[in-house]
A protein has these predicted regions:
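A conserved beta-strand element that flanks and buttresses the S-adenosyl-L-methionine
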Residues: 92
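Short glycine-dipeptide loop
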Residues: 116-120
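A short, conserved alpha-helix within the catalytic core of class I
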Residues: 100-111
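Class I (Rossmann-like) S-adenosyl-L-methionine-dependent methyltransferase catalytic domain
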Residues: 1-34, 41-82, 103, 121-173
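Alpha-helical scaffold elements within enzyme catalytic domains, especially in hydrolases
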Residues: 64, 111-114
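Hydrophobic adenine-recognition pocket in adenosine-nucleotide-binding enzymes
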Residues: 96
Length: 176
């Protein structure tokens, strides 16, 4: 049975405890890291540390993000064309890859690897996630993502966050 939660952006941790997986991922990167968040949505996955920025292509989501998190920095940015004048310590993307067709996912991965100094972290649905028919209708690229995400992220180390639901892929940049 797929997990449906009204506790967004939290995941259950035991019966009465909830964890904010996005914030835990950000915190795990270390203090004072500059983090680029690709596909930031309404900003929960964007770090507040100085020099960090969240990018997204949806102006409405960016407006909501700026209102929710005035202490964070957000920019309009299409990962196919967005170019940074500098590199970031860490590049993250959370719950975004499955929203895109494969050719765009590959470009997102390439851009992330070119922009990160230390590591790239992708957090998304598990490849064996069982999505409802309704979810599959709303997420047209989900099936393709589940079929190809491991192949597309073959150079990344895969970690299970919630079995059958949520995985993380990490690529450590050599020499960092």
């Amino acid at each position: 049975i797929p997990y449906e939660s009204s506790g967004f952006p939290y995941l259950p941790n035991g019966i009465y405890k909830w964890i904010n997986v996005r914030q835990n991922i950000i915190d795990a990167q270390g203090k004072n890291k500059t983090i680029l968040d690709i596909g930031c949505g309404i900003g929960f996955s964007t770090a507040a540390s100085h020099g960090s920025v969240g990018i997204d292509t949806d102006e409405d989501l960016l407006t909501k993000a700026k209102n929710l998190f005035p202490e964070k920095r957000f920019e309009y940015g299409n990962p196919l064309f967005w170019k940074s004048k500098r590199k970031f310590d860490i590049v993250t993307s959370m719950f975004y890859l499955h929203e895109n067709p494969r050719y765009i996912r590959k470009k997102i991965v390439k851009m992330a690897l070119e922009t990160a100094k230390e590591r790239v972290v992708f957090v998304d649905l598990a490849p064996d996630y069982f999505g409802s028919d309704e979810l599959l209708k709303r997420k047209p690229f989900l099936k393709d993502y589940m079929l190809h995400c491991r192949e597309d992220l073959i150079d990344f180390e895969e970690h299970v966050i919630v079995k059958g639901r949520l995985h993380m892929w990490v690529y450590e940049i050599s020499g960092s």
